[in-house]
Every structure is written in C-alpha cells, then in structure tokens.
Amino acid sequence: MKDINEIKELIPHRYPILMVDRLEELEPGHRAKGVKNVSANEPFLQGHFPDRPLMPGVLQIEAMAQVGACALMSLPENEGKLAVFGGVDKVKFKRQVQPGDVLSIEVELTRVKGSIGKGEGKVYVGDELAAQGQLTFALVEK
C-alpha cells in the first residue's frame, strides 16, 4: 500500500486535481488499484451541480489516468520522466458518483512499448461499476 506522500513521489498532481488518496495494490508496469474518497468539500462539486452534487465523469477518467500513471511511473527505468494522458476510448459511465462515495480505481496496463502505454481502467463504488474505459499514456522527459 502507498499513502498520499508516496503517490506524490510517483505523479506530479496536487490539490485540487489529485484524484487518488492511496494505492492499495501496485504491480510496477502492470497494474494498480487506488482509492478516492469523494468528499462533500470537493471544489468541483460547487458547480456540478449545486442542488445535486455529482462527480464529473471527466474526473473519473482522470482518476483512472492517475492510477495508471502510478503503475507506469513505478518502474525504475521511468524515473525522471512524466506520464501524460494521451487519450481515452470506449468510455462508459454506469453509475453516478456523489459525495460520500468511495471509489475503487483499477487500471491494468495492457501494452507498454517504448514511450507509449495502453491500459484498461475501471472505477467502482462498492461492487458497482461506475465507469470504464481504455487509456493511452505517453512518457515524456520532465
């Protein structure tokens, strides 16, 4: 398990865009499982939507991308590089995410070749699938 400080050593994201509170599982270069506690105090909930706060789907995708970046950046050969989000395909949202939900974010890297990586991401609330999609990452020099 990795706490928030260890996550910050892997990826450069910080408040308010850091979407991973801890990593429960990490297999460098293969897969990672992270957790995000969705608080009623999240800045994005002020406007999405004031009378019915929901976590935007794009931020669920961002959470998957950050967990995938942790799996990619945990490889020693990627030290000194930055994993950037290259794209997303076949995204589906299955369930709304609201304050109080605890997200379990799973990403499996399906292909890493050179500076490009691909992965499958899923976001769960409990046992319910909330979102899923295919992710593309690119490694660049810092």
Curated annotation (Swiss-Prot):
Keywords: Cytoplasm, Lipid A biosynthesis, Lipid biosynthesis, Lipid metabolism, Lyase
Entry's localization field: Cytoplasm
Catalytic activity line of the entry: a (3R)-hydroxyacyl-[ACP] = a (2E)-enoyl-[ACP] + H2O
GO process annotations (BP): fatty acid biosynthetic process; lipid A biosynthetic process
A molecular function (GO) term: (3R)-hydroxyacyl-[acyl-carrier-protein] dehydratase activity
Keyword Metal-binding in annotation: no
Active site positions: 48
GO cellular component term of the entry, any: membrane
Coiled-coil regions, chain positions: none
Pfam families xrefs: FabA (PF07977)
CDD domains in the record: FabZ
EC identifiers of the protein: 4.2.1.59
Similarity field: Belongs to the thioester dehydratase family. FabZ subfamily.
Record's function text: Involved in unsaturated fatty acids biosynthesis. Catalyzes the dehydration of short chain beta-hydroxyacyl-ACPs and long chain saturated and unsaturated beta-hydroxyacyl-ACPs.
HAMAP family for the chain: FabZ
Name of the molecule in the record: 3-hydroxyacyl-[acyl-carrier-protein] dehydratase FabZ
Gene (UniProt): fabZ
